[in-house]
From Swiss-Prot:
The modification Pyrrolidone carboxylic acid is found at Q24. InterPro entries: GnRH, Gonadoliberin. GO terms for molecular function: gonadotropin hormone-releasing hormone activity; gonadotropin-releasing hormone receptor binding. It is found in: Secreted. Stimulates the secretion of gonadotropins. Belongs to the GnRH family. Keywords: Amidation, Cleavage on pair of basic residues, Hormone, Pyrrolidone carboxylic acid, Secreted, Signal. Residues 1-23 form the signal peptide. Its main location: secreted. GO terms for cellular component: extracellular space. This is Progonadoliberin-3.
Length: 89
């Protein structure tokens, strides 16, 4: 390559790298520069003003029973037998 072509390629690569490095990452709920919106800050301050206690809605008894129900245990002999590979053997 001629020196002119090498310089052009280097300038293009530098521009691409600078574009990637200087671009800002936008996440959900965040503004550029890592700042949150004022509405979320207000809600956080209000919650802190209540003593940090957040009231949760009451659960129905069916939801509580579903959450506390134990898993079904199919087989207590949970060891691995290398010789027995298939169920029919």
């Amino acid at each position: 390559m001629r020196p002119y072509n090498v310089i052009v390629v280097m300038v293009v690569l530098l521009a691409l790298v600078l574009h990637a490095v200087l671009s800002q990452h936008w996440s959900y709920g965040w503004l550029p520069g890592g700042k949150r919106s004022v509405g979320e800050l207000e809600a956080t301050i209000r919650m802190m003003g209540t003593g940090g206690v957040v009231s949760l809605p009451e659960e129905t008894s069916a939801q509580t029973q579903e959450r506390l129900r134990p898993y079904n245990i199919i087989n207590d002999g949970g060891y691995f037998n290398r010789k027995k590979r298939f169920f029919h053997e």
